Amino acid sequence: MTAPLSLGWPAPAKLNLFLHINARRHDGYHELQTLFQFVEHCDYLDFKVLDKPELKLHSNLAGVVADSDNLILKAAKSLQQHTKCQFGVEIWLDKRLPMGGGLGGGSSDAATTLVALNQLWETGLSATELCELGLKLGADVPVFINGFSAFAEGVGEKLQNVEPAEPWYLVLVPQVHVSTAEVFQDPELPRNTPKLSLESLMNSPWQNDCQSLVAKRHPQVAKTLGWLLEYAPSRMTGTGACVFGQFEQEQEAKDVLAKLPASIQGFVAKGANISPLMLRLAQC
């Protein structure tokens, strides 16, 4: 077994550079086309391998039971059960990404847990096998395990690696919770965007089909997006509430961040086509 204590495993945020909803399936899920890109802004997880099969989790968010916390333990347990691993783990989560918001933080934490423990427990699963486990935890988990910017189709499980530009982003976090389930159940959600080839999509204006609905239902999202659009091309990520503006230079994004009203939180981060998680795995 590898060294029992392993530090600094990143769980990066993702952005949906576009999100098109093509149809609603008979099972209630939605057919979609989307482009995922990572940003270099992450949660961090530390792992201590235990010689008995118990699972422990600590977080810097004292007293807060977040979806990401639950998914971390679910991920560890799923790998443990699938591989019949007799080791356990103690995990420390340094939560830096906003919870909810469309940045994929909970799914990313779960993916990092699967990737790290597969290495530390020496369970030997392939990336494909890890993705199959991850998909049972959440539709976005496989893209974080895959570790590369990706075009996704189906319900988000069919991935094709792509290399969009890697600009700087200013990501803003409206102080409102948007329910993904409510967005996808809303009768006013557009569900008829035509399916296009990847080549056509990469050369077309990008949009998020959820954006207008979420902005209508949540004025704080509309207000935040309107403010950011004064400075840069901007969209919502996922089902919100976070929005992002694109900049060529880091300083441009930081200059706009400095003007941000005190009531809105935000951060500047660079787009990354290779996940920081993959770079950490390569160090093992």
UniProtKB/Swiss-Prot annotation:
Binding site for ATP: P98, M99, G100, G101, G102, L103, G104, G105, G106, S107, S108
Residue positions of the active site: K14, D140
Pathway the protein contributes to: Isoprenoid biosynthesis; isopentenyl diphosphate biosynthesis via DXP pathway; isopentenyl diphosphate from 1-deoxy-D-xylulose 5-phosphate: step 3/6
Single GO molecular function: 4-(cytidine 5'-diphospho)-2-C-methyl-D-erythritol kinase activity
Record protein name field: 4-diphosphocytidyl-2-C-methyl-D-erythritol kinase
Record keywords, A-Z: ATP-binding, Isoprene biosynthesis, Kinase, Nucleotide-binding, Transferase
UniProt keyword Secreted present: no
Species per Swiss-Prot/TrEMBL record: Shewanella halifaxensis (strain HAW-EB4)
GO biological process, one term: isopentenyl diphosphate biosynthetic process, methylerythritol 4-phosphate pathway
Enzyme Commission (EC) number: 2.7.1.148
Top-level EC class as recorded in UniProt: transferase
Role, per record: Catalyzes the phosphorylation of the position 2 hydroxy group of 4-diphosphocytidyl-2C-methyl-D-erythritol.
Coiled coil residues, start to end: none
Family per record: Belongs to the GHMP kinase family. IspE subfamily.
Record InterPro entries: GHMP_kinase_C_dom, GHMP_kinase_C_sf, GHMP_kinase_N_dom, IspE, Ribosomal_Su5_D2-typ_SF, Ribsml_uS5_D2-typ_fold_subgr
